[in-house]
Amino acid sequence: MIEYMNYVIKSLQSNNDYEHLTLSSRSLLNFKIPNAFKFQLSNKSTPYTYNTIDISTNKVINGSITYLYTDAKGLDKLIKDSHNINIQSIVETYNHHCKTLNINKQNVDFKSLYYGRMYYPNSHLEGMIIKKFTTNTQVVLKWVSSFNSCNIITGYFQKYGKRNFQELIVSSNDFLCGYRFLHNFIEQPSKLNNSLYNNSYISLGGEFWLAISTLSPTCATTLRYCTHSATTGRPLTLTLSFNPLFGHLSSTYSAKTSSNSAFCVQYDFNLYSIDSNLSLGCELWKQNELIQNVSQEKSKKQEIQVPPNFYNNNSNDAKQKRILNDLNTTFESSLKKIDKERAVIENFETDLYNKDFTSVWKFSTSLRDKNLCILWDGKFKGFLLSAGTELIRINTNNENNSQSLVKFYPAKLGLQLQFST
């Protein structure tokens, strides 16, 4: 479960960038597990300012104070308190990349955003400034400061587009410079209608880095394919990532198996060391059984009526008329099939968006790490709760006999509570 300030920033930013190219697999496999007790209290003091204070206990008491200001208007329609928030908005879950998801999404325009956070008792500071010059270009400045002379400043110049994304990065840490890009290969809409195939597209992204102080380069590229099932309308995503310098190859398959579940499998392989790993992850959503949304009825498919002899009504030849009637019947069935596929996709995503979920279970495991990660996110009486653990496998020797026993013990265990007004 993401924090409140990240939820506010996420509502203002686009996820059409290289960083979110493999978001679906990361959300199902590498989700964050709390390792201590943490309580976070947030509120919206003015229409443009947000405040957060949190306290955590991990052997010692730690905490932080966060402040955010933005000149965005109309955030009341997007930012909800913990009692009215949609749990799908604050949980890192399967990311729908296809175009039909933007059913009820609203765009909020803003020119600047200021974010600051101070940790205590160590007094670490972190901040961020986002300044938009145009609708598609912005500059992001992030910095981290502490008393042990650890001061890092990183600047980003980002340019967004419907199909393209470009980003230049400069950091004071080893004078690191980087360039990241993303291009979406979207098929042109059909002249007849928007069909299933217009919701399938390929995304290609890459990143190039160079540490000027040590002259250490690195690069990576990622390919993503998104589509829907023709019969059920459920989305699925395939990614392939490759780092040529380290020889790391990673492939993922993520699918929304139903409106209440998602599954992901990832296979990693190194070309140089021949090491491999297989990771599995899934999430199970629970719907509120007391509150049923009446408006979740499936929309009726729109049938396109093609009149007989549509292409030629002036032919006097009986044989030619029979051929034209066969052509009309063929095109009519194709149009109905196109509309049926589109209706199935739109109905699935509309039904998913309108469902009232109360909690979600997440599970992930890895053959190489031999662990089991469990996370539960949910709502209870206006509070947002997140509890999880990571079980790892260890071998212990039995004193009575020399046989080794396999045991599992929790390497991480924690509980996080959030409340916002």
From Swiss-Prot:
The protein's role, per its UniProt record: Component of the ERMES/MDM complex, which serves as a molecular tether to connect the endoplasmic reticulum and mitochondria. Components of this complex are involved in the control of mitochondrial shape and protein biogenesis and may function in phospholipid exchange. MDM10 is involved in the late assembly steps of the general translocase of the mitochondrial outer membrane (TOM complex). Functions in the TOM40-specific route of the assembly of outer membrane beta-barrel proteins, including the association of TOM40 with the receptor TOM22 and small TOM proteins.
Source domain of life: Eukaryota
Protein name in UniProt: Mitochondrial distribution and morphology protein 10
Comment field on protein domains: Lacks alpha-helical transmembrane segments, suggesting that it resides in the membrane via beta-sheet conformations similar to those predicted for other outer membrane proteins and porin.
HAMAP family reported for this sequence: Mdm10
Main location: mitochondrion
GO-annotated cellular components: ERMES complex; SAM complex
Matches recorded under InterPro entries: Mdm10 (IPR027539)
Species lineage: Eukaryota, Fungi, Dikarya, Ascomycota, Saccharomycotina
Species this protein is from: Vanderwaltozyma polyspora (strain ATCC 22028 / DSM 70294 / BCRC 21397 / CBS 2163 / NBRC 10782 / NRRL Y-8283 / UCD 57-17) (Kluyveromyces polysporus)
Record note on quaternary structure: Component of the ER-mitochondria encounter structure (ERMES) or MDM complex, composed of MMM1, MDM10, MDM12 and MDM34. Associates with the mitochondrial outer membrane sorting assembly machinery SAM(core) complex.
Range of residues in the leader sequence: none
Family of the protein in this entry: Belongs to the MDM10 family.
Gene label: MDM10
Membrane topology: Multi-pass membrane protein
Compartments in which it is found: Mitochondrion outer membrane
Biological-process GO terms, alphabetical: establishment of mitochondrion localization; mitochondrial genome maintenance; mitochondrial outer membrane translocase complex assembly; mitochondrion-endoplasmic reticulum membrane tethering; peroxisome organization; phospholipid transport; protein insertion into mitochondrial outer membrane
Keywords: Membrane, Mitochondrion, Mitochondrion outer membrane, Transmembrane, Transmembrane beta strand
